[in-house]
């Protein structure tokens, strides 16, 4: 796989796939971190004398034009970061777009309209996607993928364009993800630990199976811990649990025991009868029948933090409790704070909820790396080859 700084891009037109799927309130962007993250690649391209045609998606328009999902706000915000006007094309393919692209001069940037206004972008088969990727590729000399957030999706702009493009490469954001996540999986400094939380074991099975045996310790919190507690024969009251995965949880615990990975589960909890009010702390042997386990308790937080403090590499995905509700946020925030204050450790965070915890704690600058991917981050940690990387490797 080649990267943008390995190609001669002077005077070339770049077709750059980015992840600008940002939250909007009307036409106002409420969080522009995804746009900000791509700026270094844009600045490098412009400094080297290239022009850039930007392509991205926003929301789920389901193959139809939806005016409220136009990329106009993203084009405006990108222009503000680059100090120039970034005109928005009326579509992403077609004669008018081709004319705009042909007239683009070195040092200029234009943005294509939402790729998902065309059903072909997300169609399942190459036959259904048709020539959509070829039409996009024809707009430029070089394809640049800088969108880790969609690297796990076999969309036309991710997997078809590289095969149709004259040249292709990864941008700096994709390069960062590749290097940090690759290092975490292959050359991690030890002790190496994984911290996983969130609601469901089912969404983390791949990570559990791939990392157990590779990490020294695996901390499990959040509602997904309930399924493991049930597998140990413990009561969990009315807590969220995946009863169909109890046997799977037992298998995972057995695998950890035989492979040298120490599994850490919570032993006390903040519980409630509803998700608004905390009733207090209970330990794992005295969970109220009408109670829900909604956060790890102080003893569990202390135990988890001791494991974190002695680690050199940490990969974190998923909160320790229902952090969106203030009474049940303390476990996640405590774990976050301890990670953020480590001086000599590589700390890697991924996933929307985990990212939200870090921003809620205002500690985003204290982590080694915060991944821009949700599903991509999970699949990378599952050991899967992401479609975006496969396409770039095969066409570099």
From Swiss-Prot:
Positions of ATP binding: 204, 324, 351-354
Gene Ontology terms for molecular function: ADP binding; ATP binding; phosphoglycerate kinase activity
InterPro entries documented for this protein: Phosphoglycerate_kinase, Phosphoglycerate_kinase_N, Phosphoglycerate_kinase_sf
Annotated compartments: Cytoplasm
Catalytic EC class: transferase
Record-listed E.C. numbers: 2.7.2.3
Catalyzed reactions: (2R)-3-phosphoglycerate + ATP = (2R)-3-phospho-glyceroyl phosphate + ADP
Residues annotated for substrate binding in this entry: 19-21, 34, 57-60, 116, 153
Keywords: ATP-binding, Cytoplasm, Glycolysis, Kinase, Nucleotide-binding, Transferase
Pathway: Carbohydrate degradation; glycolysis; pyruvate from D-glyceraldehyde 3-phosphate: step 2/5
Top-level taxon in the UniProt lineage: Bacteria
Pfam families per the UniProt record, alphabetical: PGK
Chloroplast found in the keyword field: no
Gene Ontology biological process terms from the UniProt entry: gluconeogenesis; glycolytic process
SUPFAM superfamilies per UniProt: Phosphoglycerate kinase
Single GO cellular component term: cytosol
Subunit text: Monomer.
Family: Belongs to the phosphoglycerate kinase family.
PANTHER family with a match to the protein in the record: PHOSPHOGLYCERATE KINASE, PHOSPHOGLYCERATE KINASE 1, CHLOROPLASTIC-RELATED
The protein's name in its UniProt record: Phosphoglycerate kinase
Organism expressing this protein natively: Maridesulfovibrio salexigens (strain ATCC 14822 / DSM 2638 / NCIMB 8403 / VKM B-1763)
């Amino acid at each position: 796989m080649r990267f943008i700084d390995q190609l001669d891009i002077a005077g070339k037109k770049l077709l750059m796939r980015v992840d600008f799927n940002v939250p909007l309130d009307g036409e106002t962007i409420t969080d522009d971190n995804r746009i900000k993250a791509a700026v270094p690649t844009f600045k490098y391209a412009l400094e080297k004398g290239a022009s850039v045609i930007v392509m991205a998606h926003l929301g789920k328009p389901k193959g139809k034009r939806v005016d409220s999902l136009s990329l106009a706000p993203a084009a405006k915000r990108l222009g503000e970061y680059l100090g120039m006007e970034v005109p928005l094309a009326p579509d992403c393919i077609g004669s008018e777009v081709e004319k705009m692209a042909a007239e683009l001069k070195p040092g200029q940037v234009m943005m294509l309209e939402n790729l998902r206004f065309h059903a072909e972008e997300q169609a399942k088969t190459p036959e259904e996607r048709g020539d959509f990727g070829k039409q996009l590729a024809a707009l430029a000399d070089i394809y640049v993928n800088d969108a880790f957030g969609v690297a796990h999706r076999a969309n036309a702009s991710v997997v078809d364009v590289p095969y149709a493009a004259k040249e292709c490469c990864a941008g700096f954001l994709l390069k960062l993800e590749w290097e940090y996540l690759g290092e975490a999986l292959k050359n991690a400094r030890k002790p190496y630990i994984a911290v996983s939380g969130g609601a469901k074991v089912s969404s983390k099975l791949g990570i559990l199976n791939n990392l157990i045996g590779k990490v020294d310790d695996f901390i499990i919190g959040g509602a997904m811990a309930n399924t493991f507690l049930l597998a140990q024969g413990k009561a969990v009251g009315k807590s969220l649990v995946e009863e169909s995965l109890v046997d799977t949880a037992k298998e995972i615990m057995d695998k950890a025991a035989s492979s040298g990975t120490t599994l850490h589960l919570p032993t006390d909890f903040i519980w409630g009868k509803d998700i608004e009010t905390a009733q207090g702390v209970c330990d794992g042997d005295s969970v109220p029948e009408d109670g829900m386990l909604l956060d790890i308790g102080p003893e569990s937080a202390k135990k988890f933090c001791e494991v974190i403090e002695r680690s050199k590499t940490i990969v974190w995905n998923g909160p320790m409790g229902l952090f969106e509700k203030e009474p049940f946020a303390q476990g996640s925030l405590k774990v976050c704070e301890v990670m953020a204050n480590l001086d000599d450790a590589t700390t890697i965070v991924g996933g929307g909820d985990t990212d939200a915890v870090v921003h809620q704690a205002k500690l985003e600058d204290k982590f080694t790396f915060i991944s821009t991917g949700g599903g991509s981050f999970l699949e990378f940690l599952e050991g899967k080859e992401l479609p975006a990387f496969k396409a770039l490797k095969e066409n570099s």
